[in-house]
Amino acid sequence: MIMKYVLAIDIGASSGRHIVGWMENGEIRTKEVYRFPNAITDQNGHLVWDTESLVSHVKKGILEAQMAYPVESMAVDTWGVDYVLMKGDKEVLPVYAYRDSRTEAAIPEVHGIIPFSELYRRTGIQFQPFNSIYQLYADKLAGRLEGVTDFLMMPEYLLYKLCGVKAKEYTNATTMGMVNAETGEIDAEIVSRLGLPQQLFPKLSRPGTVIGQYEGIKIALCATHDTGSAVEGIPMEGDDLYISSGTWSLLGVKTPKPLTDENSQAANYSNEGGVGYIRYQKNIMGMWLINELRRELCHEKNFGEIVKEAEKSTFDMTLDVDGPEFIAPKSMKAVFDAALKVPLTKADYFRCAYLSLAQSYRKAIEELEANTGKTYDKLYIVGGGAKNTFLNRLTREATGKKVIALPIEATAIGNLKIQLEGLENEQI
């Protein structure tokens, strides 16, 4: 049997990686061939992405992969909601990042035209101030849509820079808050009522679709939203809970159909696109909390040291860390201080953060079980946070679930799995 090699380009908010994968003895084997930093930068008071750097690193990593393996296909996944506006083949700069505050004025205007209760019934997507629907309306208010011929979600933009084909992939499109939950396509009435250009919203493509090639390598669509690929990469046995633990914690379960009822809306649950299923999940606070505290309090310490000190602390107060004040504060320490109003050691801040994350998970699971009418026994945790044994223990204690922590590159594995299955079925 001839070995088939595929390349996953998996890019998160703080780093990207190129991972080659192949099937061996019924299991996906992987080898990381390139890793690079990524970061939101401040430009004239706005938070933006350096897309030129991203494209450069993507191409460098592909070259490294080609030098080491006979790669047949590749796919890109990134975070959701962010996009690049295009005028023909030219980018409209800057490319704003989801943490920027530019949507503040757009949100009430959007909800004045389409109440959120109606948006939720149509799309099933939880309210987040950075959802693409609000970003696009902010662009409309700012006049940035004039002359725009297209917009590409971040992974599709990177693929366009490789092969010249403009695509819109289903799982990532659902993060926009504009895909109809029942039809799986862009809701034309939402587009019309908001006065957005209809030509920007063509039919969506599904994971497994080949859209072009680059340097002799087929370019395929995986679940281009990283969480969509991550859920594909979790070896769940059945109806199990999952947390994709990174900058954000994505907690959810697979469902055959969307749940867009009032209880799901009240709990702010999302119905995001999966590979043949719906990801009924909630976007809640994650390692962003820890990373920001570390940057401010003890950037010289590694996470292992921080965890050990947090375990020794006896601090037991918790915070609701899913409040808007935690999204992009100038000082995370100041947010904690304002809420707790007691003196803390550095270790206390981190213990409070870990305890609060575990309680956030507990609350989200209670809501999920009430809304689905099911009780779940197992909780799979993947992503960077899965390596944190202290947080895993706190999560087990808070939720009462059997926690199965898999410190694997679940997103890359899911990306690779979609490609390998496509090659096996001769769809790629």
Task: Tell me the role of every PLM-derived stretch.
Residues L7-A8, H111-T123, Y137-T149, M153, ...:
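Active-site core segments that coordinate phosphate-bearing ligands/cofactors
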Residues G16-G21, D82-M86, G177, S229-G233, ...:
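Short beta-strand scaffold segments in enzyme catalytic cores
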Residues S53-Q66, T183-E189, S360-I365:
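Short, well-ordered amphipathic alpha-helical segments that serve as non-catalytic structural scaffolds
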